[in-house]
Amino acid sequence: MLNEFINFETISRSDWQRFYQEDQVSLTPEELESIRSLNDKIDVQEVRDIYLPLINLIRIYHRAAEDLTFSKGIFLQKAQANRPFIIGISGSVAVGKSTTSRLLQLLLQRTFPKAKVDMVTTDGFLFPNQVLIDKGILNRKGFPESYDMPLLLNFLDTVKNGGDVNIPVYSHEIYDIVPGLTQKISQPNFLIVEGINVFQNPINQRLYMSDYFDFSIYIDADVKNIKTWYLERFQTLLELARKDENNYYHRFTKLTKEEALSLAQKTWKEINLVNLENYIEPTRNRAELILHKGDSHKIDLIHLKK
């Protein structure tokens, strides 16, 4: 069997952290806490060792993209419009995609003070629950067929070509698209697109979301760790929903601790694990960079495409 990482440069954490530059911006513990997702663990040292070198790498790709746009303009003998630098971030549920995305957004804003840095999640392109019910696929929520891929691809195409667009907003508290609420994306310099499906496209195999990406990241971890983090997150969500009857997870607070754990394990085994093994993990080698997390959520290995 061909080694999946044959086209990647594998870099240890100790080697990677040497790419940090002393004059780079950093963050305070309070700022990190404000962007941290449930049960995710990140500290200032992780930012310095992993994410500041990553910002250096993104700067290289960004500069190369600008140079290519300029050179194309000379070749075509016409001015080329500025296009947003789009970063795709993928990985399993509970692996820390959202924290990584918000962290990169903050660091990019510090690194490029005059730039507009927006972030979207592909959750907003899930079909509303009623549509999933009508299609008979509510139990497949999060799988490729549960996303409005034409809408998602049209969004990327519009933004890449300088247009403004309003997109749906998803709420984990109500477990559905929020009726009447949209997020406006208007000519950002950087756009971070985060979701489990950013390297997939089940509708039109001739066009992938990744065709619009200038840089892409896959957050990786051993399955046993992802399962543990998922179960921990589920318990945290229940605690947060205990006094909020409008929260989707409130209904599960009526269960005993053992019943709730059993439900979470069943959901992991029948939905999230299947989705990871069949649809998410097989796309990771489409990423430009793979960040592997160890037991303690720390990045311990980096794979960079050659």
Swiss-Prot record:
| Chief localisation class | cytoplasm
Q: Which GO terms describe its cellular component?
A: cytoplasm
Q: In which pathway does it act?
A: Cofactor biosynthesis; coenzyme A biosynthesis; CoA from (R)-pantothenate: step 1/5
Q: Does the keyword Transferase apply?
A: yes
Q: Does the keyword Transferase apply?
A: yes
Instruction: Give GO MF terms, alphabetically.
Output: ATP binding; pantothenate kinase activity
BP GO terms, sorted: coenzyme A biosynthetic process
Q: Which Pfam families match?
A: PRK (PF00485)
Ligand binding (ATP): 91-98
Q: Which UniProt keywords apply?
A: ATP-binding, Coenzyme A biosynthesis, Cytoplasm, Kinase, Nucleotide-binding, Transferase
Q: Which reaction does this enzyme catalyse, per its entry?
A: (R)-pantothenate + ATP = (R)-4'-phosphopantothenate + ADP + H(+)
Q: Which SUPFAM superfamilies match?
A: P-loop containing nucleoside triphosphate hydrolases (SSF52540)
Which InterPro entries does this chain map to? P-loop_NTPase (IPR027417), PanK (IPR004566), PRK/URK (IPR006083)
Signal peptide as annotated in the record: none
- Supply the EC number(s): 2.7.1.33
Location within or outside the cell: Cytoplasm
Stated family: Belongs to the prokaryotic pantothenate kinase family.
Q: Which PANTHER family match?
A: URIDINE KINASE (PTHR10285)
Which protein, by its recorded name, is this?
Answer: Pantothenate kinase
What species is this protein from? Streptococcus thermophilus (strain ATCC BAA-491 / LMD-9)
